[in-house]
């Protein structure tokens, strides 16, 4: 299991919350105090709750669940895309389309359209169109790629949502709640933690803080995936071994 240390959290600035005038009282249990008008997050609680979230994500990945990384604010976009790709999962880092989860069948039609446009470019069939039509199709593809590129390979709604800043991603959190999809989130002092299944109290504005926590969640996915692959491999080997055994018929000894 990947550990997170107090030193790592401090160096990344995970303990810095929002200004005291911009806070959600529901975050009080996770706040250590205030300094120069800024709330300081209790990192001992962050460490404990992070471990809970890490274990949950590891178990989910081991069970074969997919994880959707969500972070559309500028500070989160790169980390969310890079870490989701590193662990072979999906992401939304540009704009959350309403109904992305609750109306996934319609969203999937747009994903299929994006795949068709990709195929047309790859196999050269787009060359059959006029230059003007090609330009129009290219712009359509670019727009779809920007919004849906991170979920292009997602065939169904995910098993888990990992969210950077649930206040900013309230529509995504709301849709997940409606569908009963567990939400793991980096929750700052201005957020409402009530709809989050696994709260990780922390700074959701600093790039280093976001990168640290997001990369650790990607590690959890990788760890769970490795355990799943090892289990499946062992099962396959045992099955092969059983199938390969010769059945030797016993013959009675001659008197």
UniProtKB/Swiss-Prot annotation:
Matching NCBIfam families: rpsB_bact (TIGR01011)
UniProt GO BP: translation
GO cellular component terms, A-Z: cytosolic small ribosomal subunit
Compositionally skewed regions (Acidic residues) per UniProt: 236-255
GO molecular function, one term: structural constituent of ribosome
Residue segments, region Disordered: 231-255
One Pfam short name: Ribosomal_S2
Similarity field: Belongs to the universal ribosomal protein uS2 family.
Gene (name only): rpsB
Keywords, in A-Z order: Ribonucleoprotein, Ribosomal protein
The organism of origin for this protein: Geobacter sp. (strain M21)
Ribosomal protein is among the record's keywords: yes
UniProt-listed PANTHER family: 30S RIBOSOMAL PROTEIN S2 PROKARYOTIC AND ORGANELLAR, SMALL RIBOSOMAL SUBUNIT PROTEIN US2M
Superkingdom of this protein's organism: Bacteria
The name this protein goes by in its record: Small ribosomal subunit protein uS2
């Amino acid at each position: 299991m990947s550990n997170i240390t107090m030193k790592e959290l401090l160096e990344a600035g995970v303990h810095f919350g929002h200004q005291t005038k911009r806070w959600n009282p529901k975050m009080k249990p996770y706040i250590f105090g205030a300094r120069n008008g800024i709330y300081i997050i209790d990192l001992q609680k962050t460490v404990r709750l992070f471990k809970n979230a890490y274990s949950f994500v590891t178990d989910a990945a081991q069970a074969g669940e997919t994880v959707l990384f969500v972070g559309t604010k500028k500070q989160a976009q790169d980390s969310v895309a890079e870490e989701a790709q590193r662990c072979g999962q999906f992401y939304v880092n540009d704009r959350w389309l309403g109904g992305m989860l609750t109306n996934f069948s319609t969203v999937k039609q747009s994903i299929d359209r994006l795949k068709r446009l990709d195929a047309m470019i790859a196999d050269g069939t787009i060359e059959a169109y006029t230059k003007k039509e090609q330009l129009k199709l290219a712009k359509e593809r670019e727009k779809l790629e920007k919004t849906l590129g991170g979920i292009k390979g997602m065939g169904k709604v995910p098993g888990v949502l990992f969210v950077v800043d649930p206040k900013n991603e309230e529509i995504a959190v709301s849709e997940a709640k409606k569908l009963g999809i567990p939400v793991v989130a980096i929750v700052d002092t201005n957020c409402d933690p009530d709809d989050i299944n696994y709260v990780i109290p922390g700074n959701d504005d600093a790039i280093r803080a976001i990168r640290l926590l997001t990369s650790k969640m990607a590690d959890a996915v990788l760890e769970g995936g490795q355990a799943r692959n090892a289990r499946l491999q062992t099962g396959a080997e045992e099955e092969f071994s059983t199938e390969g055994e010769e059945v030797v018929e016993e013959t009675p000894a001659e008197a």
